[in-house]
């Protein structure tokens, strides 16, 4: 027994080891499955929550739908009630007016002693009401028949079609049938009323009915309808055939025939639609396919060549219709022959006489002869463009007026900003003489000052003071170079007065008064030597920029002292720092023009 036990122990140990290892694997697999189960449970919970939310939303939508339907139905009922009441009011009003009209006719007959009508007004009104009731009954019958035919047609076609599309088609066919039936019934009722009214026995009711039935649908107004006003419409010729009284049975026969025809047409339409849907089994009929065919060219089933051919044909037709000969229209026969015989496409393109009129080159409707365009020698450069715009063909506007653009040369803006084509650097100089502002007195002002001085000389009281002070002839002494400026003798004054007598003769009396008054007032003043200032001073004119140099003189033209003591320049070109030497009044502005020079030389 001991040998068996000793021999069996290692096998048991191996089995135990295998069991331990498998147990670990089982534990790992268990953990994985538990985690997966927990995740799945969480996802199920979230899905349940979402489903509950969706159910709540669906229930809310259903409630809203029910409310909206109830509102729509109530609105429809209200609208129908309003319509019915309004129509009843209108009908009663029309009947009342008819009664009034008939009463007027009867009263006129009585006044004029004419034979009265065989039937009274009340009887006519009763007849109209009976006709109304019979027409309503006929309409109800037609509606019931049309509904029955529509239901039979819908049961046969609903098997192959979608529910919404079939219902819409049935409703449309029923509406058409009802509209036609109503129009027919109205026409027949109109003919009956015309037949019963007195004085209208000459008109044929059958012709009226046929004209109404066979009348075309009113077409849309176009521009060509203006020409129709040229032709006067002919009046309808009355036929001499006997009258045919339409009864209610004839009305019903006509309406039943129209209903049968419309039922056949609707059945044919349904069969055609069924056949179309048998070809397209899986594709649902929708409006998007038709929209895609027209709007998106990639989704279109037609090949591109067919589309291009169609567009070319349209363009050629439009070009053929355009009128080139403006002042000469061909006769009607030629137009009809040209319409019947279409010219080939090659003849239009190859014919040199045929001018293709584009949007840019329009035919000008004027009597003036067009001048031939001059071919300019210089060719304009093309505008820079990208690769996408190179394929587009259209005439670009000219950038310049026939001049080629050379981008190497400086632009006009650069020329305006700098004085020359050279670069501007720090070595450039500015001429200060160009910035001079010089105050030059005009000849008229100088003459006026001389005249005032001469008047002051004539007055006896002021002569002594003027001789003593010597302030009257300051400006005269500046102009005269040879005469000294410091001392004035009586002889020099007399000479100047005799020289300027010619100027003093033209002075007005007003100036004399002003000068006398000024001198009388100036006797009391302390500064008697500078009181000889005229009151009527001219306004200073605007300063002008002159090109002569600025002389830094203390005693320039505006100074009132007679003598120049210091001057800062010997010559105008010299620097002002070294102008410390006194110089004579020989440096004057030279005359600029030939005329002024000649005058100076003569003087």
UniProtKB/Swiss-Prot annotation:
Belongs to the shugoshin family. Residues 146-157, 201-214, 483-512 have a biased composition (Low complexity). It comes from the Eukaryota. Pfam families: Shugoshin_C, Shugoshin_N. It is found in: Nucleus; Chromosome, Centromere. GO terms for cellular component: kinetochore; nucleus. Residues 218-227, 362-376, 594-603 have a biased composition (Basic residues). Keywords: Cell cycle, Cell division, Centromere, Chromosome, Chromosome partition, Coiled coil, Nucleus. Residues 11-74, 304-325, 431-451 form a coiled coil. Residues 455-467 have a biased composition (Basic and acidic residues). The keyword Metal-binding does not apply. This is Shugoshin. Residues 112-164, 201-227, 331-399, 455-519, 583-603 are annotated as: Disordered. It comes from Candida glabrata (strain ATCC 2001 / BCRC 20586 / JCM 3761 / NBRC 0622 / NRRL Y-65 / CBS 138). Residues 583-593 have a biased composition (Polar residues). GO terms for biological process: cell division; centromere complex assembly; establishment of protein localization to chromosome; kinetochore organization; maintenance of meiotic sister chromatid cohesion; meiotic sister chromatid segregation; meiotic sister chromatid separation; mitotic sister chromatid segregation. InterPro entries: Shugoshin_C, Shugoshin_N.
